[in-house]
Structures are given as C-alpha cells and as structure tokens.
Amino acid sequence: MNLLRMNALTSKARSIERLKQTLNILSIRNHRQFSTIQQGSKYTLGFKKYLTLLNGEVGSFFHDVPLDLNEHEKTVNMIVEVPRWTTGKFEISKELRFNPIVQDTKNGKLRFVNNIFPYHGYIHNYGAIPQTWEDPTIEHKLGKCDVALKGDNDPLDCCEIGSDVLEMGSIKKVKVLGSLALIDDGELDWKVIVIDVNDPLSSKIDDLEKIEEYFPGILDTTREWFRKYKVPAGKPLNSFAFHEQYQNSNKTIQTIKKCHNSWKNLISGSLQEKYDNLPNTERAGNGVTLEDSVKPPSQIPPEVQKWYYV
C-alpha cells in the first residue's frame, strides 16, 4: 500500500513538472510572436518603440500582449519600459495609436528621473503589466485607515528585482512577489514587485519573506526611493496606503485580477462618457505596418547626471 502510494505521488509530481515545462514552452512561444521596431532617436521627442506581430503588423504593448496570468505559479507578463540604472522616463503611451513606448515630457521637455544618492536612475528594471488598468473612474477601497483613491489611469507598474539589466521593449515572464500601494498626487499607483522567472533566484523566492532572505534591505530601500524620488523636482514626499506595508503575493494577484477586469471595461468602450482622458485602445487587426527607422541615441543632457541628497 505504501509503495503504491509512493508511486502515485511520484507520478503526480512528474505530471506537475511536465505541466510546468509545457506552460513554460507555450509562454516562450507566445513571446516569440512579438518583436519591436523603433522610430527616431532615443532621448528625442521623436522616439517611439512599437510592438510588432509575426506578420509585421503593428500592435499595442498595452492591449495586444496577453496578461498570461498563472495563479498557481504566480506569473504574469511584464513589458520592460526602463532598464535598471537608466534615467530616461520611458513609458507606454496612453495617447498615441498602438501605445508605443515613448519618453515622457513636461512642458515640451523630455523627462529624466533624478539620481537619489547613492543610486543612479531607476533602482530596478521598471515596466508595466499588460492588459491591466488602474481605473480612474471609481474610488478603490484600501486599508481600514486609508481614504478611498482613484486609479492613476495607467497599466499596473512593476519593479523587476533580478540580477540582469533588461532591455526596453522586451516581454518577460515574471513571478509576482508582492506589491506596494503608492499614493502619488492623490492617486493610487500600485508598484508590483516581481522577478524574471529565468533569474537564478526565481525558484527560491515566492513571497515577501524570501525577498528579505535573499535580497536583504531591498524592500525598505524600494519604499524609500519611491517616497523621495520626486523631491528634487520640488514635489513633496510620497506616501503609501496600508500603513506603508507591502501586500503579499496572494493579495497582489487579486489586485492584478481586479485591474485586468478594469482593463476589460476600458476596451469595451463602456467608460467613454465617464472620463475624458481614457487611454487609446486601438489594437492590431487592421494590417497597419511601419518602417523601422532606428537612429543612434542622442546625448543625455549633462545635468541629468547630478546627484541629489534627500
């Protein structure tokens, strides 16, 4: 009886492992369905990086890359917008057709993140979770002591903490580890903490406690960076919901699911009369193509290299 039971358990374990391998292969194949093309020179107003499909058609990073949520493995897709240690504030455009990655601007000038001593640029690979949306048309209930907040009208942000510096526009399968509810200019702006599934430490980390074991201090450092990073631009310190505590991976998965449902409402067109500044929802399917016109990157202004002591 014990031998039969052991054989059954072994067989089940092998089946689970085969399923994991199959899902991983399918995920890799899905990622190979996409590529990118670039127009203009990086660090200029004309720079755009577009998603393209296998047939050369232009798609949307925001809407055409699948969320690909696996609740058992706690994995999703991530679009890399800003590689670690770089300063350009690149993001998926909400206004332009097909939502290319562009550099954010303010008053017609390109935006760069300030260097908060002792760091240079963004302290993590920074990006977005596709097919999610933080809904600005409704107030979201948070902790018992928190005021309900509206979403920031963007896809969910994520911070990848692995060892590699990732490439802008790349699509990565990442493991969800937790999240931090940033309050930015009175809006809810979740920061989801993830790690690339191909990182050597990914198999050892599945929640906040393991992050502290393998990356001691990184959660506190991340919170302090997000608290202070706008101060050099004359903004006040940012604050956080839930008494500044990170939410665990299970709660974060629920947040991702809610934001995926919000995204479904967005692309349905049912919210057009509720909000004036909704993101562009044009997706692949009409055969639109563009020429790749890569140009060498322009020089970063020297003042961007300045360190700020906050």
Curated annotation (Swiss-Prot):
CDD domains: pyrophosphatase. Mg(2+) 1 binds at residues 152, 157, 189. It catalyses: diphosphate + H2O = 2 phosphate + H(+). GO terms for biological process: aerobic respiration; phosphate-containing compound metabolic process. Mg(2+) 2 binds at residue 157. Keywords: Hydrolase, Magnesium, Metal-binding, Mitochondrion, Transit peptide. GO terms for cellular component: mitochondrion. InterPro entries: Pyrophosphatase, Pyrophosphatase_sf. Residues 1-30 form a transit peptide. It is found in: Mitochondrion. GO terms for molecular function: inorganic diphosphate phosphatase activity; magnesium ion binding. PROSITE patterns: PPASE. PANTHER family: INORGANIC PYROPHOSPHATASE. Homodimer that binds non-covalently to a protein complex in the inner mitochondrial membrane. Belongs to the PPase family. Involved in energy production. Its activity is stimulated by uncouplers of ATP synthesis. This is Inorganic pyrophosphatase, mitochondrial. It comes from Saccharomyces cerevisiae (strain ATCC 204508 / S288c). The lineage of its organism: Eukaryota, Fungi, Dikarya, Ascomycota, Saccharomycotina.
